[in-house]
Structures are given as structure tokens and as C-alpha cells.
Amino acid sequence: MDFTTLMRSGKQTGDHAMSFHVPETWMQGRTTYGGLTAALCLQAAMPTSGGRQIRSAQVAFVGPVSGDVECTATLLREGKNTVFTSVRMMGEAGVAAEAIFAFGAHRESSLNFANLPAPEVTSPDETASFFGESP
């Protein structure tokens, strides 16, 4: 199953809850790849965003993720420009992941960082070792 199909396979199980089945092809050993775990949590959080863009994500990988999982989103705070949402992913063995997402509205800025030139830096051979000399 490809990524897009897996993301679309989620089923609403409550107001802010979704269930997914993670096939073995998405496993690395006994758990699911971390990026997929984070993406499933984000998928459950998106309906709480109010159309705002994702601005930050913090994900704690608590336990193995495999088979059937349920992601439940909780709206922590909604302001004029930002939304904070937590997601708990539960699997067959209990809590699998906890995530907090911040969504924010686009804001115009007088600052433009798009085309800044790269700074001048020394080559790695000319830079002092951070760890000291190696044996």
C-alpha cells in the first residue's frame, strides 16, 4: 500500500478521532517508520486546524506502532491566528505516540529571508575540532 492510499484509508471513529491499519510493509522491525507515525497523527489533527498551515510538530514515539491504531485529537487552544492540538495514538499495546501540533494563519511580514546569500565559512579542514584531537 502506498503512502497516499494509507493516508486516505483512515476512518472517522469520533469527532476528532481516526483509525488506521498499518500494514507490515510499513514496518521496520516491530514498529512503524517514525515519519508515518507522525503523519498519521497529523492527519487526525488537521480537522482542528481551521484551515491554518502546520507551523510546528513535536512527536514522542512512546511504544511500538503496528496493525490497528487510533489517533484522537484534542484541541488545546484556538486563538485568532493559531491553533494548538495534541494527538494521542493508541495501538494494541497501549499508547504508541503523543504529538503536539501548532497551526498558524499566514501573516504578511516586512522581512524577506527568501534570497539571502550564504555566509562565508571556513573549510572543515581549517575549523577547530569540536571534540578535540582524535586518537
Task: Locate each region found by the language model.
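Terminal targeting signals and extreme-terminal segments of soluble enzymes
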Residues: 1-135
